[in-house]
């Protein structure tokens, strides 16, 4: 459980909210510290004070956004048909995709985890598709992220969603 819940009016909370918007719309490298500080109406020093670095802020907001995504996807898998895991996994992919598009989290969720961080999306999908193939989870996670990046780069969401619908998961 999280030790700190952001208060949107505090400098730390404003930074977190600004970072979610900035990193959702642009890649990590495209977001400048000065832009984050200006959007949050704080000095750049506040970023270093509260998060240690731009990467620390990114990791903080990515973890939060990813947790919200996984909660929705886990719910879709759990609500799915036990006898048709393919339909449950496909529903989870679509629920997650719709959430990311609606909230504007295309870039932050479209990028794979940085460094040694565990890929929790791939782990969820691997667990949900274990009977089909041991590598299917990471493959589906990559396809899902590619759909988000396609939308971020101008593809219509319905086209990317249709591509996800075209994925077929069959037991071996």
Annotate each predicted stretch with a short phrase.
Residues 1-10, 172:
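N-terminal intrinsically disordered/low-complexity leader segments
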Residues 17, 82-101, 134, 138, ...:
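Amphipathic alpha-helical segments that line or abut small-molecule/effector binding pockets
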């Amino acid at each position: 459980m999280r030790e700190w819940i952001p208060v949107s009016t505090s400098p730390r909370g404003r930074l977190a909210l600004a970072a979610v918007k900035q990193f959702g719309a642009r890649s990590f490298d495209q977001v400048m510290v000065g832009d984050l500080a200006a959007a949050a109406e704080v000095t750049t020093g506040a970023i270093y004070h509260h998060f240690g670095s731009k990467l620390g802020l990114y990791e903080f907001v990515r973890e939060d956004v990813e947790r919200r995504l996984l909660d929705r996807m886990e719910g879709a898998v759990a609500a799915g048909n036990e006898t048709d895991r393919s339909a449950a996994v496909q529903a989870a992919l679509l629920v997650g995709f719709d959430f990311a598009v609606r909230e504007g989290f295309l870039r932050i969720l479209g990028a794979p985890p940085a460094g040694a961080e565990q890929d929790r999306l791939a782990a969820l999908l691997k667990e949900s598709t274990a009977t089909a193939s041991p590598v299917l989870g990471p493959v589906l996670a990559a396809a899902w992220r590619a759909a988000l990046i396609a939308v971020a780069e101008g593809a219509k969401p319905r086209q990317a969603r249709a591509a996800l619908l075209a994925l077929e998961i069959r037991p071996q």
